[in-house]
Amino acid sequence: MRPSTRFLRSVTRTVPIGFRSTTVPFVSSTLRSSAATSNQFSARFSGVRFYADEAKKEEPKDENDAAAAEEDANLTEEQKKIKDLETKLDAKTKEASEFKDRLLRSVADFRNLQEVTKKDIQKAKDFALQKFAKDLLESVDNFGHALNAFKPETLEQSQELSDLYTGVKMTRDVFEKTLKKHGIEQLNPIGESFDPNKHEATFELPQPDKEPGTVFHVQQIGYTLNDRVIRPAKVGIVKDNEN
């Protein structure tokens, strides 16, 4: 028997009959309200217990999901790290390739610079005497002028003049030999075709027995220094009769 029913009966017994008509409705209403409150509390309590039980049941599942999510997060983070490392590796590889290309270019430039410098040094060495040699050429010419001043018949008549001639000639020969040792050589183009890069034409004359445009007379001998013309030869060339 429910407590509300017992309470109703006890009240009914204790209350006088005259008062039952007015008291019973009030008591019944009160009891119904109390019963409803009790039922609502029971329902709420049972709901709380239900949710608590469900929470306890779902707690292991949630923990598993959290662990899986954390594992996924860790995997994703590792993948991000791997991707980041791959990106950095690609960048470093590209940078290393650029450095290698720069190094190869620098080595090539350095070798070219070495070759150019070597050639420049050799040129400077070869032509360092150019100005000095040009200044000496006038002295060599003077030896030639002195020798040409001697007449053959005079040399035969005077031993002293013959000895002087021989001494001057020997001095000139030694001088020219020394110049040749340092790359300075004579340019005597007699009988050669006229070359404006090596010869300087001072006059033209027709020569019946010679080919036009050839050198038939050398007015002044030219000189070269290591195959570079330092003084062109002054020449007379054969003129073409048709012109």
From Swiss-Prot:
SUPFAM superfamilies: Coiled-coil domain of nucleotide exchange factor GrpE, Head domain of nucleotide exchange factor GrpE. The gene is mge1. This is GrpE protein homolog, mitochondrial. GO terms for cellular component: PAM complex, Tim23 associated import motor. The keyword Transport does not apply. It is found in: Mitochondrion matrix. Belongs to the GrpE family. Residues 56-79 are annotated as: Disordered. The keyword Electron transport does not apply. Keywords: Chaperone, Mitochondrion, Transit peptide. Its main location: mitochondrion. GO terms for biological process: protein folding; protein import into mitochondrial matrix. Component of the PAM complex, at least composed of mtHsp70, MGE1, TIM44, PAM16, PAM17 and PAM18. Essential component of the PAM complex, a complex required for the translocation of transit peptide-containing proteins from the inner membrane into the mitochondrial matrix in an ATP-dependent manner. Seems to control the nucleotide-dependent binding of SSC1 to substrate proteins. CDD domains: GrpE (cd00446). GO terms for molecular function: adenyl-nucleotide exchange factor activity; protein homodimerization activity; protein-folding chaperone binding; unfolded protein binding. InterPro entries: GrpE, GrpE_coiled_coil, GrpE_head. The lineage of its organism: Eukaryota, Fungi, Dikarya, Ascomycota, Saccharomycotina. PROSITE patterns: GRPE.
